[in-house]
Every structure is written in C-alpha cells, then in structure tokens.
Amino acid sequence: ALQKAQKKKLRREARHFESLRNETVEKFARGHQPSEISTPSFVNDFRISNVICAGDNITGNVMLRFDITPLYGGFRLYMGGERNGTAAYAKGAAYPSSDHYGRVYTMRGGQPEHVVVMFYNIAPGIDTLDRVDISMGLALNTLNIITMRNVPIFWTYTDKAIRNFVREKSAKGNANQNQN
C-alpha cells in the first residue's frame, strides 16, 4: 500500500511538472513568434496564429504546433508530409517532417484547427529554425507552402526525464529521512 501511495505521489508530481512546463512553453511562445509567416495566394482566406515550437533536448525531437483558422467556409485540408515538401531548415541542414504524406484536417469556417508537425533529430545548440516549410492543399496534388522564418524553439525535457528527475529527488529525500 505504501508503494502504491508513493507511485501515486510520483505520478502527481510528474503531472505537476508537466503542467508547469506546458505553461512555460506557452508563455515563451506568446513572446517569441516567428519573425515572418508567408502564405501562398489562396491562403489569404486563413489566419495562422499561436505558433508554438517546443523541442525535447534529450532526443532532439521538435514539435511545431499552430492554429489555422479559415475565415470563410469549411473544407478539408491536406497538411504536412515529408514527400510533399514539409521540412525545417537550420544552420544549413534540412530536417524533413516525420509524416510521409501528412494529415487531413477538417476545417470549419471561423474555428481554429490545431495543426501539429514533428521534426526529428534536430542538432543540439540550435535555438531557432531558420525556415520551416509546411505544405498544405485542398488535394494531395495541389500543394502550396506556408513558410515561417526564424521560428524560436523552446527546449524542454521529456515527461520521462521529468519523471526520472522527480524519482531521483524523492529517493534523495528518503535517504535524508533515514539518517535522522
């Protein structure tokens, strides 16, 4: 029963750290948006906002999340995909998207849709993506590219790293209590 209670406490602490991290990432993103977001001609009907780019500095995985709001009617939109030209560029290297073909998003007029694009193995020490190209289109063969320039990355640790950190801390705490 004691072990179960400790596990529960650990999980609660990990969740607490996770929510703190998520708040910090959001706060950082609010103050650090890409310097420029250029969209293709037909995307004048869209608004792109709330760009959040967070990386995990243990694995080098970077998640780019943003909201895309169609100003008029609803439709389906193909988004992302390595084979369609979605990639991030930093310090002369290209990092293709994790998806081969991307995903289909169902857009509703006036409602923001969260879009998530993952990039893997981004080299350590890169704190800004020079350019991110995200392909989008009404069909797989009519793709346009959204280009974001100077996208700041907020580096954080994975949940696993947070859990390990919490676990080590609690182990140290137990060791100290035993000495008293």
Predicted regions and their residues:
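N-terminal post-signal-peptidase region of extra-cytosolic proteins
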Residues: 48-51, 69, 99-102
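Short, solvent-exposed beta-strand/turn "edge" segments of beta-rich domains on protein surfaces
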Residues: 50-63, 104-109
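Structural motif
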Residues: 43, 90-91
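Low-complexity, acidic Ser/Thr/Pro/Gly-rich terminal tails and inter-domain linkers that flank the onset
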Residues: 26-58
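Surface-exposed edge beta-strand/loop patches
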Residues: 12, 17-18, 22-39, 76-89, ...
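Alpha-helical, heptad-rich or low-complexity scaffold/stalk segments
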Residues: 1-11
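Short, well-ordered beta-strand segments enriched in hydrophobic/aromatic residues
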Residues: 62-70
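An anionic, turn-rich surface loop/hairpin at beta-sheet edges
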Residues: 93-113
